[in-house]
Amino acid sequence: MERRTRRVKFTENRTVTNVAATPSNGSPRLVRITVTDPFATDSSSDDDDNNNVTVVPRVKRYVKEIRFCQGESSSSTAARKGKHKEEESVVVEDDVSTSVKPKKYRGVRQRPWGKFAAEIRDPSSRTRIWLGTFVTAEEAAIAYDRAAIHLKGPKALTNFLTPPTPTPVIDLQTVSACDYGRDSRQSLHSPTSVLRFNVNEETEHEIEAIELSPERKSTVIKEEEESSAGLVFPDPYLLPDLSLAGECFWDTEIAPDLLFLDEETKIQSTLLPNTEVSKQGENETEDFEFGLIDDFESSPWDVDHFFDHHHHSFD
């Protein structure tokens, strides 16, 4: 008698669940629930569509396992997980605080061994100038500020120090032009102000007397005597020698002054022979002797008494 073999398609689905509990003595640690379906089908339309096709039977098994873990309960496990998270967050915050980088300053760099180096770039030579190594970043920044102010002046960009204020540039040509225009405006006055003047414009310069020592005075006097020894100053009271003048001194075309009274009377007598003036002139010449002293060639008349006499006569 022949035995036929039958093809069967077998499928198993397993699900595992862990439960945290403390099992008592004699209680199982694993619970397995198995369910087998010998007439399982893939879909409800398999029987209708495949009437003429050989159908392979299908068997499905569903297995569900519950495992009891020896340890704490679920609530204690959750509390422990929350505490662990808090510890991790605290550790992370500490790491962040310790890993904060120091503040960066202009012209300052930190060396691998911890110190700070400062350097600056010279714009004129286009080279870097080494300023030194410092313990703190602030010291290096101050060194950079001083060098920047020295090189760039008011235009320097600094960290702490304040650069000096720029000095104003004075244009001399503009200032001189303004002064000239102001002076010209002040000098323009009306014609009525010609006779007026400003007392403030006149400046008085006082000369201070300098006192010399006796030795200095004696040397100055000697120098003046030596300098005046070779000079001849004319005497203002001495009359010039007219005899040396010659004919050039007297102009023949111009008549000389009438110095003498007798000559005047002679001229009047010649011009007016029949007048009384000529007679009076003759009488006056007879009464008065008008002569000259040989030594000084001057008149011997007493001029002072003559004017006194006429003065009393008028009184």
UniProtKB/Swiss-Prot annotation:
Q: What biological function has been recorded for the protein in this entry?
A: Component of the cytokinin signaling pathway involved in cotyledons, leaves, and embryos development. Probably acts as a transcriptional activator. Binds to the GCC-box pathogenesis-related promoter element. May be involved in the regulation of gene expression by stress factors and by components of stress signal transduction pathways.
**Major subcellular location class:** cytoplasm
Q: Which GO terms describe its molecular function?
A: DNA-binding transcription factor activity; transcription cis-regulatory region binding
Alphabetized UniProt keyword annotations: Activator, Cytokinin signaling pathway, Cytoplasm, DNA-binding, Ethylene signaling pathway, Nucleus, Transcription, Transcription regulation
Q: Where is the protein situated, by its record's location annotation? A: Cytoplasm; Nucleus
Q: Which InterPro entries match?
A: AP2/ERF_dom (IPR001471), AP2/ERF_dom_sf (IPR036955), AP2/ERF_ERF_subfamily (IPR050913), DNA-bd_dom_sf (IPR016177)
Induction (UniProt): By cytokinins.
An annotated GO cellular component of this protein is: cytoplasm
SMART domains recorded: AP2 (SM00380)
Where's DNA bound on this chain? Answer: 104-161
Give the protein name, as stated in the record: Ethylene-responsive transcription factor CRF6
Highest rank taxon of the organism: Eukaryota
Concerning CDD domains, the annotation shows: AP2
Family the UniProt entry places it in: Belongs to the AP2/ERF transcription factor family. ERF subfamily.
In terms of Pfam families, this protein maps to: AP2
Which GO biological-process labels does this protein carry?
A: cotyledon development; cytokinin-activated signaling pathway; ethylene-activated signaling pathway; leaf development
